[in-house]
């Protein structure tokens, strides 16, 4: 871990540009959404759009704006999937959704922020949410796993080679090594 900066600088000189794994993963996940998994994405976006039309606060969002915001949230999703049900989600699930939305907002400052607030209510359905809203949330949860697999494992891992041994399923090429304490804590 102590030589991570040196290796990154060497890699950047080798490829001729500054590159970070989170950016490569983001671009690769956007590619997966737009190409390999686009039909599933269109079905999901249509379902989210139908939800938006049911509420006066969100009915002015166009299908196009929902697609753009949803694509960004999916591309920024930090984990394979969440397991959220109406009003019930672990702190980790809520944190993953909030992190994805925050990163999507950061990467797209010109996008209307209220659409991200609406998407949060879709992805984290409140207690008492109706079956339609729950099904849309579940569809999103089922969609993010193949996007992660296709975007990160099958694409980003083949585009980012600072230290190839980090590019394994379950690995994170952005992090070089762990402390002994972290290793023992993970094995408890």
Predicted regions located by residue number:
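Alpha-amylase-like alpha-glycosidases and glucanotransferases acting on alpha-linked glucans and related
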Residues: 1-89, 94-188
């Amino acid at each position: 871990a102590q030589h991570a900066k040196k290796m990154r600088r060497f890699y950047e000189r080798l490829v001729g540009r500054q590159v970070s794994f989170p950016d490569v993963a983001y671009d690769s996940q956007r590619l997966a959404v737009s190409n390999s998994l686009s039909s599933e994405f269109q079905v999901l976006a249509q379902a989210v759009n139908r939800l938006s039309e049911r509420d006066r606060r969100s009915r002015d969002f166009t299908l196009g704006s929902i697609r753009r915001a949803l694509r960004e949230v999916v591309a920024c999703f930090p984990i394979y999937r969440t397991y959220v049900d109406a009003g019930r989600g672990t702190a980790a699930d809520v944190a993953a959704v909030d992190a994805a939305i925050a990163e999507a907002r950061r990467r797209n400052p010109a996008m209307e922020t209220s659409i991200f607030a609406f998407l949060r209510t879709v992805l984290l359905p409140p207690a008492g949410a109706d079956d339609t809203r729950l099904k849309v949330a579940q569809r999103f949860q089922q969609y993010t796993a193949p996007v992660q697999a296709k975007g990160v494992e099958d694409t980003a891992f083949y585009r980012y080679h600072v230290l190839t041994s980090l590019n394994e399923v379950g690995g994170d090429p952005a992090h070089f090594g762990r402390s002994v304490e972290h290793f023992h804590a993970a094995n408890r």
